[in-house]
A protein has these predicted regions:
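Gly/Ala-rich beta-loop-alpha elbow adjacent to hydrolase catalytic centers
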Residues: 97-101, 105
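Conserved serine/cysteine hydrolase catalytic core
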Residues: 188-246
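Active-site loop/oxyanion-hole signature of alpha/beta-hydrolase fold enzymes
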Residues: 12, 54-96
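Alpha/beta-hydrolase fold catalytic core
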Residues: 1-26, 47-50, 90-91, 275, ...
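Conserved alpha/beta-hydrolase catalytic His-Asp/Glu region
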Residues: 152-208
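Catalytic histidine-centered segment of alpha/beta-hydrolase-like enzymes
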Residues: 258-267, 271
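Flexible "cap/lid" loop of the alpha/beta hydrolase fold
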Residues: 117-156
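Conserved HGGG/HGGXW glycine-rich cap/lid loop of the alpha/beta-hydrolase fold
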Residues: 18-64
Length: 290
């Protein structure tokens, strides 16, 4: 059991929560429109030999929004992670990512393998890609979504319970899990509550890699990697696994009960897999499911 209270911290534009005081660091990266509370359920089970850092990605949770003239491109999250590690003077770390956070994690590990001690991907692998024939449509949709946002006003909800119930329904998670995510993503408003999330997060991306580009960017990941899939998870993730498993030299697959947020639904089961992977005998680690 963890002996440490969770600390709220900020460095530069990045807010994060941390617990533990070990020599090695574990970085946790959440999914799209989630926040660092995504990993708080792990805290009671975490090994105290590590320093655990759950990061709020830009535009999420308590981290700063991008500047008014910027947009949220996937590749920028990878660079943001590098910037955070540099600011925090973390030379090497274990990385755990969920959903979009998993995709950020595997691309970072591909680009900066010497900084990554181990990799755990939860309900996410590879990079979301598009057909080259969809390039123009992708661009037009991105421009249209920007125009639409200019004409809209941020929605105000009567209370946090209303927003929690809505998130529970949309994400198919319990009210308790939804409340944990919503609490960190909202702020008071004179007429109720409002999301802290940057509305630009919902913009269509103006650019996506083709599948061949995505595979090229990820090919040859040498970091020992654990992929955790949910038994009732997204079918898209299973397809992504089939597409991208060849990019990893050492990839092991485990399945646990639950839906897309299985790590929050079954935190002890999930964390035990993570801990075993981080403490693995490197010489015994082999590729599975190739």
């Amino acid at each position: 059991m963890s002996l440490y209270a969770i600390k709220e911290q900020k460095i530069g534009p990045f807010s994060y929560q941390s617990w533990g005081e070990g020599k090695q660091t574990v970085i946790y990266l959440h999914g799209w429109q989630d926040n660092s509370n995504s990993f708080v359920p792990f805290a009671p089970f975490c090994n105290t030999q590590y320093t655990h850092i759950a990061l709020d990605l830009a535009g999420h949770g308590h981290s700063d929004w991008k500047s008014a003239d910027a947009f949220y491109y996937f590749i920028d999250y990878v660079y943001d992670l590098k910037c955070f590690l540099d600011l925090a003077q973390i030379k090497t770390c274990h990385i755990v990512g969920h959903s979009m956070g998993a995709m950020i994690a595997n691309l970072f590990a591909s680009c900066y393998p010497t900084r990554c001690l181990s990799l755990v991907l939860i309900e996410g692998i590879g990079i979301v890609s598009s057909s080259e024939s969809d390039t123009k449509t992708q661009l037009i949709n991105a421009f249209n979504s920007r125009d639409k946002l200019k004409q809209s006003e941020p929605r105000v909800y009567p209370d946090i319970n209303t927003l929690t119930q809505l998130r529970s329904k949309i994400s198919d998670v319990s009210v308790e899990i939804a409340a944990l995510l919503v609490t960190r993503n909202t702020q008071p408003h004179p007429d109720g509550v409002q999301l802290r999330l940057d509305p630009r997060l919902k913009h269509h991306s103006g650019f996506r890699y083709s599948i061949s580009q995505a595979k090229s960017a990820l090919n040859g990941i040498s970091i020992p990697t654990l992929l955790v899939l949910a038994e009732q998870g997204y079918d898209m993730i299973v397809r992504q696994y089939s597409q991208f498993k060849g990019c990893f030299d050492s990839l092991r697959l485990e399945k646990i009960p639950g839906g897309h947020h299985c790590h929050m639904e079954n935190p002890e089961i999930c964390y035990k897999l993570i801990e075993a992977h981080q403490n693995r005998d490197k010489t015994a680690f082999t590729t599975e499911g190739a």
